[in-house]
Amino acid sequence: MSRLFLAPMEGLADYVLRDVLTDTGGYDGCVSEFVRVTGSLLPARVYERETPEILAGGYTRSGTPMVIQLLGSDPEWLARNAAYAATLSPHGIDLNFGCPAKVVNRHGGGAMLLTNPELLNRIVASVRAAVPAHIAVTAKMRLGVSDASLAIDCATALAEGGAASLVVHARTRDHGYRPPAHWDWIARIAAAVDVPVIANGDVWTVADWERCRAVSGCADVMIGRGAVSDPFLALRIRGLMDGSPSDQEWPLVLRQIATYLKKLHARIASCHEHGRVKLWLSYLKRTWPQAAELHAAIRRMQDSLEIERVLEGLPGAATAPE
């Protein structure tokens, strides 16, 4: 059976949304937003804040294993931080070689590292040597910066450095998130390396998942924004829910939104809560027209309690008990 993973999504899939989405079900694992590593050893409180799953043995509340993702460009400091992070009960250490954000790339991190296969190899080898053998070290990459000319060289460098598996987002950095994802390139990479490759990019529906697997040749798939747009996508892929979204599911989505807002109360400042809910609704609009109506209704609201009252007034929005 194909495995399904919830992707790391910086600025989108924080701990609270990871908790809500994995609680919905269908995922074999999830990866945290990246933890940025510079020239210091990060203390436990950073991981407790960014990856609270470590306080529960490395699992989300639903029991989904969580992998900590690190982002940086210095092999020594990444290795030191990975060695410490490995003591905190994650189910693996993932290395970010795909972030397209300008602020990250400006400092030589994320996708910018795809210009230097030799450095990629040194980073993975250093981290692999520093982390106990029973903890997997994995990597997530894009196809390159402006083109895919070094894609196979980079993937080979990562695999030879000791990465247990590779997630390949089938776009370059400059491609951003614009469609289409080039799943055929994932197939080329998978044929060139001796480690498992997990396909990623543009999986919004069950049909997309089927096409992605067929074109890439990969059994396993990592889902990102498609999971945010349709929280039931993993269950649809597994055949546990209808293959296409329906109006009958909207009350379930409302309950998820209400639960999400409730959980945000305990995690972030109230002045930021409204923005997170609106951000999620902006993705849900792709799947449910009702989300567009709700987004329009709360668009100017900045008080999360006011948004909560709107949700409470909608049929089916009552949250499930904790």
From Swiss-Prot:
Entry annotation: catalytic residues: C99
For this UniProt record, the keywords arranged alphabetically read as follows: Flavoprotein, FMN, NADP, Oxidoreductase, RNA-binding, tRNA processing, tRNA-binding
Q: What residues does FMN bind to?
A: P8, M9, E10, Q69, K140, N200, G201, D202, G224, R225
Task: Tell me the Pfam families matching this sequence.
Answer: Dus
Which top-level group of life is the source organism from?
Bacteria
- Needed co-factor(s): FMN
Site Interacts with tRNA: give positions: R36, N96, Y177, R276, K278, Y283, R299
- Known EC number: 1.3.1.-
Q: Does the keyword NADP apply?
A: yes
SUPFAM superfamilies noted in UniProt: FMN-linked oxidoreductases
Kindly state which reaction or reactions the protein catalyses.
Answer: 5,6-dihydrouridine(16) in tRNA + NADP(+) = uridine(16) in tRNA + NADPH + H(+); 5,6-dihydrouridine(16) in tRNA + NAD(+) = uridine(16) in tRNA + NADH + H(+)
Q: What is this protein for, i.e. what is its function? A: Catalyzes the synthesis of 5,6-dihydrouridine (D), a modified base found in the D-loop of most tRNAs, via the reduction of the C5-C6 double bond in target uridines. Specifically modifies U16 in tRNAs.
- Similarity field: Belongs to the Dus family. DusC subfamily.
Recorded protein name is tRNA-dihydrouridine(16) synthase
What is the scientific name of the source organism? Cupriavidus necator (strain ATCC 17699 / DSM 428 / KCTC 22496 / NCIMB 10442 / H16 / Stanier 337) (Ralstonia eutropha)
